[in-house]
Amino acid sequence: MNPRKKVDLKLIIVGALGVGKTSLLHQYVHKTFFEEYQTTLGASILSKIIILDDTTLKLQIWDTGGQERFRSMVSTFYKGSDGCILAFDVTDPESFEALDIWRDDVLAKIIPMEQSYPMVVLGNKIDLEDRKVSQEVVHGWCKEKDMPYFEVSAKNDINVVQAFEVLASRALLRYQGTAENHLIDSIKLSPGQPKSRCC
């Protein structure tokens, strides 16, 4: 029996102020609704261990502050991340419109910069009745960007686990592809090189 592989992944969650990033993260990691609203200054980090595709994943999830004045500081946390959740509030059209800026900012800062960087979009607060962002508009935007979309509620724990685990699965695939490419590159031999002989 093979021992289960272990992989550490760094995920980030970004979006405008007040969309519920911290509540989503607490619901996923602790199965509790984070009722007390406090602005995240900079970033906070929570970890969760899950088993996915016979691999033990240690997810280090960075909850970033959504205030404009912290954006330049927060963007330094994007470096080295393996995947990103773009969150918005379905009752706040401006938070949805800001997703382009958040997405572009993440893609500009990740290292290494590449197009296959996994992202998922979460429309939070579907438990509220005053929805202002239609599903059709969001689905169109996500289809154009080739990103999965989840309608979620941190308060009622709707689709939260599924969304995080789809991102984790995509990040794992990317990680495995990167690790495989490094292995292939490191074992390539140049043909025709003479071997040195001793005595």
From Swiss-Prot:
Q: What is the residue range of the motif Switch 1? A: 28-41
Signal peptide range: none
Binding locations of GTP? 15-22, 34-40, 63-67, 124-127, 154-155
UniProt short sequence motif Switch 2, positions renumbered to this chain: 67-82
Q: Please give the chief subcellular localization of this protein.
A: other
> Could you tell me which NCBIfam families the record lists for this protein?
small_GTP
Q: What family is this protein classified in?
A: Belongs to the small GTPase superfamily. Rab family.
What protein am I looking at?
Answer: Ras-related protein Rab-7b
Species assigned in the record = Mus musculus (Mouse)
Taxonomy, top ranks, is: Eukaryota, Metazoa, Chordata, Craniata, Vertebrata
